[in-house]
Each structure stands twice: as structure tokens, then as C-alpha cells.
């Protein structure tokens, strides 16, 4: 009787364990992308900056290169002081992680509501990110976004 109870308990444990939804934890560039999206949707400049290494380089659409913490802060400060981020979508994403380096790519859609009261603007384009694991966390070291080329339909959802 005791062994039967032990077997039934073990079987029940296995059934419950393997029937739970399994989801791989996000790592590398994918984890940084998730943190960046959350920070942007919250319009939180400091949280956005935490996703970048202090020596990162950023190319935003229609903006000059931002190299290092000071220039990256200035680039996002300008964007967030003039606009409220309403939506951020990354689509057609791909990720590859090799040791302490990770690459991410895909398409983006960023919906901005100008604080001047103008109509919302939807920016679409393509991006490539390189992230590194530094000090126990993943951060962008390269973030390159480019506007969607003329004549394309933009990101697919």
C-alpha cells in the first residue's frame, strides 16, 4: 500500500510538471529587447539607458550616430521629451547567442504621440542589435535601426 501511494504521488507530480506550459527564458539580445520595449512603453529614459553599455553605439532612423553614454542619453532624451511612446512592436525577429555575445534582428514599429498635440506618428523599419553579457547582465553594444525603405509595407504582425 505504501509503495502504491508513493508511485501514485510520483506519477501525479510528473503529470503536473510536464503538463505545465514550457517557455525558454529569454537571454541575450532577446532579453535586452524585452527590457528596452518595457522601458520605452513606460517612457522611462533611465530604464532605456540601462539597456545600453556605457560604450555602446546607436544609430536611430534620421538621427546622427550616438556613441557612448552621454550621446545615447541625448538621443533618447530628445525623442522622449518631444514624444510619448504609445506602442512598440518588434516583428520578424531572429536571435543568435554565442557565449557572451548575442545578435538580434527584425522589424520594428514605434508609435509616438507628439507632446505638441500633433497626430501620432508611426515609425517603421529594420533593426540589428549586438548585445554582450557584462557584469552579469546583457546590454546593447550596437543598436542599428533604419527606416523602412520606400515601397515596402512595413512590419508584419
Describe the function of each predicted region.
Residues 7-19:
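Bacterial N-terminal signal peptides
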Residues 1-7:
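Positively charged n-region of N-terminal signal peptides that target proteins for export
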Residues 110-114, 131:
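Beta-strand elements of well-folded, non-transmembrane domains
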Residues 27-32, 45-100, 107, 118-122, ...:
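A solvent-exposed, acidic/Ser-Thr-rich amphipathic alpha-helical stretch
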Residues 20-24:
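Sec/Tat signal peptide C-region and signal peptidase I cleavage site
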Residues 40-44:
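Short helix-adjacent coil turns
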Residues 124-151:
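Short beta-strand edge/turn micro-motifs at domain boundaries
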Residues 95-102, 131-137:
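A short, structured loop/turn motif at beta-sheet edges
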Amino acid at each position: 500500500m505504501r509503495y502504491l501511494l508513493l508511485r501514485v504521488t510520483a506519477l501525479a507530480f510528473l503529470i503536473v510538471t510536464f503538463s505545465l506550459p514550457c517557455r525558454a527564458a529569454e537571454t541575450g539580445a532577446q532579453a535586452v529587447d524585452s527590457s528596452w520595449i518595457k522601458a520605452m512603453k513606460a517612457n522611462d529614459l533611465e530604464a532605456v539607458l540601462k539597456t545600453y553599455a556605457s560604450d555602446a553605439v546607436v544609430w536611430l532612423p534620421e538621427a546622427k550616430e550616438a556613441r557612448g553614454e552621454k550621446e545615447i542619453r541625448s538621443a533618447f532624451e530628445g525623442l522622449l521629451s518631444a514624444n510619448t511612446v504609445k506602442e512598440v512592436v518588434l516583428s520578424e525577429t531572429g536571435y543568435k547567442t554565442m557565449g557572451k555575445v548575442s545578435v538580434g534582428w527584425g522589424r520594428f514599429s514605434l508609435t509616438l504621440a507628439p507632446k505638441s498635440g500633433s497626430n501620432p506618428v508611426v515609425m517603421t523599419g529594420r533593426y540589428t542589435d549586438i548585445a554582450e553579457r557584462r557584469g552579469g547582465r546583457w546590454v546593447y553594444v550596437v543598436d542599428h535601426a533604419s527606416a523602412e525603405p520606400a515601397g515596402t509595407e512595413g512590419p508584419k504582425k
